[in-house]
Amino acid sequence: MRWDVVGFILGWTIRLVALPLAVVAAYSCYLDSEGYEFAMRAYLIPLILAAAVGQSLVSLARGADIASRLRDREAFASVALGWIPVVVLGALPYWLGGVFYGPAELSMDSVAVTDVMSGAIHSWFESMSGFTTTGSTVIDHATSPRCTDGSDCISSQPQSLILWRSLTQWLGGMGVIMLGLLILSQALGGGMSLARAELTGPSLSRLGPSLQWTARRLWTIYIVLTIIEMMLLRFVGEMGLFDSVNYALTTLSSGGFGTSDSGIMAFDSARIEVILMIFMV
């Protein structure tokens, strides 16, 4: 196994996670009620970690002829191992941001170390559910310190964390590794080994003359459809801007995360349901 090749690909994948983290950090600072201190704790730490670890792995292999040394075994190892750091980075905002019991909650008299450990497991589950578009959630009154009796548990979370939750599903819908292919196929050439490891369904012969061209086209379509759905939900379904953005992100990926405990039922709108059904297909 050529571990420097695997490390290079993992480094690129990890660095890509920093971009959506920067988006939610900016949202938290300027539009969310939690402010700068919360943004630094929940997002800046994983953002710096993603950038530093990713850059370190890429730098270790710099100068090596990665393209000619990339074989199927390195590609399969990269895809399999790539999910681990991606999910860990995705879990940190939940754990550090207080969706589940984390280090910040240790100052509470009723919180034990075992609660913080359970919070880490819950955060991992929520992140994995998002990136794999499973749609299961463990955010409830028993697991989240932000939920109070009689409150809507999910909507009680900071908006930036709800947005991060939706972004994990949107990225997972197309495949976070596929996003890496878009860059790596240009940087390395010969991204077909990675494609064989990540993609299922259509044969590679039908993916088009260039993997990079195919990946760019798929992501362009994905982004355009997301924007169209968001606008339809906002102006035809008369959904609020924040809700329309989140449901567009999670519907197109067929993930199912919502912005409240009741999900779509909270809107009680046939127009919204029709729009969502169309884009879920």
Which positions does each model-derived feature cover?
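Membrane-proximal intracellular helices of multi-pass ion channels
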Residues: 1-281
